[in-house]
Amino acid sequence: MMRRRAFLRGAAGLAYGLAGRRPAGAQPPSAIEDELVVQTPVSAFIVEAMLKEFAAYAKERWQVTLKTRAQRAGTPVSYERIIAWKGQPEADIFWGGEPALFQSLAEQKLLTRLETPAETWDAIPGSIGAPKAIPLKDPGRQWVGTALEVYGIAYNPRLLKRLGVPEPRDWDDVLHPKLKGSVAQCTPYRSSSSHATYEVILQSRGEAEGWEWLKRLAANTGAFVAASRDVPAVVAKGEYAVGFGVPSYFVFEEKLAGFDIKFLAPKRAFVTPEPFAILAGARRPRAAREFLGFLLSERGQRLFMERGLFPVMPRYKVHGPPGSTVELAVQLTGGIRSFFEPPVTNVYDDEVARARFREVNERFKRDIESSWSGGKGR
């Protein structure tokens, strides 16, 4: 499918991060390092496109041939890896996932203060959502959001029709008795999208009712796949009818590949700002800082929109020509053009999630995974 460039509405584009000619006689900008390593759970569909575009920009601005590398792993796995590095990281950046884990790393002094210009920093609100606020940046400047996306339900409409199950309208619909063995999900200890969605269920229903709900979900689950990216893949292929706790842009990627797959953003779904942090002890801090500047520039925000994510600044809304991939992303998410209008309904409490992160994972292993029978009553 051919992709067409998006058109942004809103204020003029941010100058920071965009290429331009230097005035005659001006000194060239300080060069960046020639390598950049990113630790991330974000899909290669997003990461590789961003790194490729940033490398081209580095060549334009600094005449640097930048070598980039993404070390991909789920957010919980990446988090534990960063702790194990003990301030001598094998990457420069941690990008993507639940803000709670970034805040925890900041408290352990494993992140470094961001030097983002005030114009850019102030354009990003401190939080989004009500009655509980989802933080979009750290007041101490240890991390900042880069783009918004929602975690929801992926489903295969043809397979649902064959099973005699109506298309889902909210979370409870994944518990339909005819879906036994037909749901795919990732474990919360491997995926932050799954973990955050577990927290949405627990915090909206209370622990006792929430865990009973999650046990019923497990009874319908036919597969706990290795990574959250695999959830929409098996749904798109028709191996499973429904995917739980799925980032919207994963579904968008499958849609662009031509699969008949749909996405639902249920009420009270979690919206992540795809946090970005520079690791303490990073060997390439200048390249890391400039990559962040690029992501938060108009050029970077446009790239996010072309790949099914949403701007982290209210000044931008997702708009594109009819039939463009940008408009397809709007259609996929039920007409959303900005997560700032109307306001997001959110029950996820970041502090609660951070305080019991390991507790939720351990209880899942003990109460659900240990007795799971593949959703088929075996």
Where are these regions (language model features)?
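A structural signal for short loop-to-beta-strand junctions that line the ligand-binding cleft
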Residues: 89-94, 112-153, 172
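Ligand-binding pocket segment of bilobal, Venus flytrap-like solute-binding proteins
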Residues: 199-265
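Early extracytoplasmic/lumenal segment of secretory-pathway proteins
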Residues: 28-104, 232
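Conserved C-terminal helix/tail region of periplasmic/extracytoplasmic solute-binding proteins
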Residues: 337-378
